[in-house]
Amino acid sequence: GSCSFCAIHSHQGRIIQTRSHESIIREAKKITELPNFKGYIHDVGGPTANFRHPSCAKQLKVGVCRDRQCLFPKPCPNLDTDHSDYIALLQKVRALSGIKKVFVRSGIRYDYLLADKNDRFLDELCRYHVSGQLKVAPEHVAEHALANMGKPGKSVYLKFMRAFNKKN
C-alpha cells in the first residue's frame, strides 16, 4: 500500500513477507490445544489482512518500483489482485478440528479487494469471517487530504461500502 502517513513499510519493508500456509496451520493447531481455547481464531491476517504476497512478480526480481505505488493513484496494471491463496488459507484454518469461527480483524485494503477481478473473496469474507462489521481504514473523506495520504478517493470507499452491505 505505502500510504504516505503509514509507518508499516518503513519498519517492515515495501515488499510483503509471506508466511506459509503450513506455518499458520501449525500455529492454529497449537492454539486449539490450549486449555482455555473456546473455538475462535480472532485474526488471520497481517498488517493488511488481504495483502499476503508481494504485489507483483517484478518485486521478486528487481524490487519495488521507485516511481510509483502499487495502488495509488490507481492500481498498477502489474498488481496481482487474486485473493484465492488467502481464501484457501482461511478455508484450511476454518476446517481444523475444534475451530468454530475464524475472524479477519486486521484491516483490509478495500481498494485492493475491489481491484480483484471477481468478488469471491468478499463473498467468503462476509459469509465466514466477519461478525457483521469489518475493520477498514477510510482515513478521511476530503479528496485533497486523501490524495496527500496516497489513498483512493471517497468514491472507492463508497463503492466498497455498497458491495459489502449488499453481501453482508
Question: Which stretches of residues belong to each language-model region?
Answer:
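Conserved, mostly hydrophobic/aromatic
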Residues: 3, 24, 136
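Short cysteine/histidine-rich metal-coordination sites, predominantly Zn2+-binding motifs
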Residues: 18-27
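Conserved SAM/AdoMet-binding glycine-rich loop
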Residues: 30-168
